[in-house]
Amino acid sequence: PTNTFDTYDSVGEREDLSDVIYSISPTDTPFISSAAKTRATAVLHEWQTDALAAASTSNAVIEGDEATLDAVSPTTRLSNSSQIMDKTVVITGTQEAVDKAGRASELAYQIAKKAKELKRDMEATITGNQAEVTGSASAARKLGSLGAWVATNDDLGASGSSGGAGNTARTDGTQRVFTEAALKSVIKSVWNAGGDPSMIMVGPFNKQKLSGFTGNSTRFDAGADATLYTSVDVYASDFGQLQVVPNRFSRDRDAYVLDMNYWGIAFLRDFTMHELSKTGDSEKRQLLVEATLESRNEGASGLVADLTTS
């Protein structure tokens, strides 16, 4: 009717803004969560590894003979540089004071968000293919990541070459389809070297590839009769069962076979936050972590590299 006053004419209506902020950004970090945690006390973190002599079938001694003195092998000394990673937040006093939807404090909300981002950065860095950089006054230190350590038991594409000792990144080769034969070969190689792998870490595309393998696998532990399971969560190899773990932040072209007893994260400074100097009407915070990857014996793990990702 004429002169009907409706919402299109109204001026004073409040906006309808939900008081919840929705985010689906993933925050799971399977490698960091599974690795042992240890302490670093210097920017260059060092440790030692050792190995037994090969088993011999000729170990027979003549009765009454003088003992022959065996050679003694020294330990191997390894190292990795600590890397500083940070996230910063600066919020004006006005933004902190105004009434906001979804959070009472902008500063607290942004700090929580940056903390999750920092953890994601650390997972992506450690599971990547980055060579160690010792750093200088003008260049940041960088840790040698997973791809720069695993070399003994790797299966690479054509023209690919192994990394080594954390200070040499692997050279990527020609990408090829992920096959069960390649996976089984690497698992066998790891076992022969003395490893007892418990995890297969893959990206999303090759997690689905692995689920199509026809070998022994566990597709579910329990569930309703009407549920169809098409994924593999546990791979039953000839040398034990391995949990299949998808990782959103590792390189999708890499499939790692891991004995997590031989990987550690050494923290020089654990995740921390501190205030930055106040230079105006704002609050500043820095979140940081300083840590490195400890490869306790890379021969206990393996890698099927250079896989297709689409």
Residue positions per predicted region:
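Flexible, glycine/threonine- and acidic-rich loop/arm segments that mediate assembly and lattice contacts
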Residues: 1-310
